[in-house]
Amino acid sequence: MIQAPTSRRRIAAALCALALTAPPLAAQQMQAAEKEVSLKTADGQDAGTVTFEQTEHGVLVVAQLRNLSRGPHGFHIHETGACSPDFKAAGSHYDPLGAEHGFRTPGGYHVGDLPNVHVSEDGTAMTEFFVPQVTLTGPENDRYPFTLDDSDGSAIMVHASGDDYIRMDSSGDRAACGVIVPSGG
């Protein structure tokens, strides 16, 4: 029987071991990623927190909101991590695909389109939902084609009115904003 030299066998064994452990290590790293974002109203009042947790299948979003008006509010991820007093610096909805706005439009929806948040009479809301296709940390890949962790970050926005899931302007003014700070920021 012909045998490869010992050093080649060791290198081959090390490469096999690395190949077998790399995917689980990457999954553990993605699972560990979490960001908590504080939201403020235009007048600087505390509007609660939103936690983003990276999972193996996308990002779990948990929002605990306060000091908002009763009723439905549009809730979106915006393209730029900036909240100026009028929140316009956050830009438009996060939309790397160039899709139409809204879950009810034939042209798809923005990656940053999220379900409405329903605020109770006491001004509070708690909701959680899942956002597939995104990651909190790079690198982008086929499984997670879009990252919220680009150089200028992203923002989470609560709008004054409910989203009709069709028209971009149906949610009204921007009521509260928080910055999803990039990892290097």
What are these regions (language model features)?
Residues 2, 26-185:
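N-terminal leader/targeting pre-sequences
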Residues 12-23:
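Bacterial N-terminal signal peptides
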Residues 2-14:
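Bacterial N-terminal signal peptides that target proteins for export
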